[in-house]
């Protein structure tokens, strides 16, 4: 049986999981084998098997901000999970581990270190997570999506995104021939963002009818009815859906996006070439979403709107001052930030480390 065996370590959020899946695809396309190390009762436990990848799990959860009992048990938990990760690495004869972040990454990486298996890490956010910060001391390659996340030279590779998003036509081609109202996409993640669901309809109601953009608004799970009711009560027309299954078409048709600033969102915006009004999730670990947002804003590819400053009046003022020319400029600037070969770059770095 040809090919090398790689163990991907990622979990907890889509921002860790989906970039890792893109790298898994790249490795498998090159004839290599992939297994996945995740946590029990987790998002990755629901998602990863759908892609035909063997999933192994550890019984571990995060410790930051959690109760004193869990912190006191950490040495025992770490010992047990490292031993289990070592067993998994030996069982599958893993030749290189790739850490993307999440609770499971540290014990998996420590197990690899103790067994002499090469470690590669990929950091998706502008502020490196705790697991990756620790593993960077032992890693053979340190890769990252945002400048300054780490100081290691030659590690800037961007965030892996789906090829169909990277392959969208350039902004100038997409925007050509567009007339009439701006088309704005609102996404708060798969669970939605209550603050966007509440504020966006109110902001549109403050604008004259002929100045209102055309809205395509993802409510998030279980929130469609209340969102549509709010739009209807305010007399504002909008197309609302619970979850957008075809994000490629949504990005293709939008002039602008109103969204959070997770690493995966920023990667998709730059890959597609779309400007954004970015409202970072204020409770993200190390406030990394604000740092992610600044990456786009500094390139004049959008605006940063801290949640504490987000009001219907402020948003209405911003929307009222937009035009398609400005949106196109933001979109073009966003596209210049894209690193569309990220998944292949991470895969090739790991293959070289496993050699």
From Swiss-Prot:
Annotated GO CC locations: plasma membrane
Compartments where found: Cell inner membrane
A single GO BP: cell division
GO molecular function terms attached to this record: UDP-N-acetyl-D-glucosamine:N-acetylmuramoyl-L-alanyl-D-glutamyl-meso-2,6-diaminopimelyl-D-alanyl-D-alanine-diphosphoundecaprenol 4-beta-N-acetylglucosaminlytransferase activity; undecaprenyldiphospho-muramoylpentapeptide beta-N-acetylglucosaminyltransferase activity
Protein's membrane topology: Peripheral membrane protein
InterPro entries reported for this sequence: GlcNAc_MurG (IPR006009), Glyco_trans_28_C (IPR007235), GlycoTrans_28_N (IPR004276)
Catalytic EC class: transferase
Residues where UDP-N-acetyl-alpha-D-glucosamine binds: 13-15, 125, 162, 190, 244, 289
Reaction catalyzed: di-trans,octa-cis-undecaprenyl diphospho-N-acetyl-alpha-D-muramoyl-L-alanyl-D-glutamyl-meso-2,6-diaminopimeloyl-D-alanyl-D-alanine + UDP-N-acetyl-alpha-D-glucosamine = di-trans,octa-cis-undecaprenyl diphospho-[N-acetyl-alpha-D-glucosaminyl-(1->4)]-N-acetyl-alpha-D-muramoyl-L-alanyl-D-glutamyl-meso-2,6-diaminopimeloyl-D-alanyl-D-alanine + UDP + H(+)
Similarity field: Belongs to the glycosyltransferase 28 family. MurG subfamily.
Name this polypeptide is given: UDP-N-acetylglucosamine--N-acetylmuramyl-(pentapeptide) pyrophosphoryl-undecaprenol N-acetylglucosamine transferase
Organism ancestry: Bacteria, Pseudomonadati, Pseudomonadota, Betaproteobacteria, Neisseriales
């Amino acid at each position: 049986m040809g090919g090398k065996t790689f163990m991907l370590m990622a979990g907890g959020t889509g921002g860790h999981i989906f970039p890792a899946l893109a790298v898994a695809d790249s490795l498998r396309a090159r004839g290599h084998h992939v297994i996945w190390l995740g946590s029990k009762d987790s998002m990755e436990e629901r998602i990863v098997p759908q892609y035909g990848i063997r999933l192994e799990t550890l019984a571990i959860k995060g410790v930051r901000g959690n109760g004193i009992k869990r912190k006191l048990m950490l040495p025992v938990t770490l010992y047990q999970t490292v031993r289990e990760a070592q067993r998994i690495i030996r069982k599958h004869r893993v030749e290189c581990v790739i850490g993307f972040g999440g609770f499971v990454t540290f014990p998996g990486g420590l197990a690899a270190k103790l067994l002499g298996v090469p470690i590669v890490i990929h950091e998706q956010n502008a502020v490196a997570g705790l697991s990756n910060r620790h593993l960077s001391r032992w890693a053979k390659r340190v890769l990252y999506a945002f400048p300054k996340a780490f100081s290691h030279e030659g590690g800037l590779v961007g965030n892996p995104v789906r090829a169909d998003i990277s392959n969208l036509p350039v902004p100038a081609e997409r925007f050509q021939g567009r007339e009439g109202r701006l088309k704005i996409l609102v996404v708060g993640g798969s669970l939605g963002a209550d603050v966007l669901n509440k504020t966006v309809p109110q902001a549109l109601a403050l604008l004259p009818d002929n100045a209102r953009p055309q809205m395509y608004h993802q409510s998030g799970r279980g929130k469609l009815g209340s969102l549509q009711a709010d739009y209807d009560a305010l007399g504002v027309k909008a197309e609302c859906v619970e979850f957008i299954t075809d994000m490629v078409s949504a990005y293709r048709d939008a002039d602008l996006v109103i969204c959070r600033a997770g690493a995966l969102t920023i990667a998709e915006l730059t890959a597609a070439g779309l400007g954004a009004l970015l409202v970072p999730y204020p409770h993200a670990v190390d406030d990394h979403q604000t740092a992610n947002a600044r990456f786009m804003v500094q390139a004049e590819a959008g605006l940063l709107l801290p949640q504490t400053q987000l009001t219907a009046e402020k948003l209405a003022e911003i929307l009222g001052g937009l035009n398609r020319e400005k949106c196109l400029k933001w979109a073009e600037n966003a596209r210049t930030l894209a690193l569309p070969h990220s998944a292949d770059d991470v895969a090739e770095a790991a293959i070289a480390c496993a050699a």
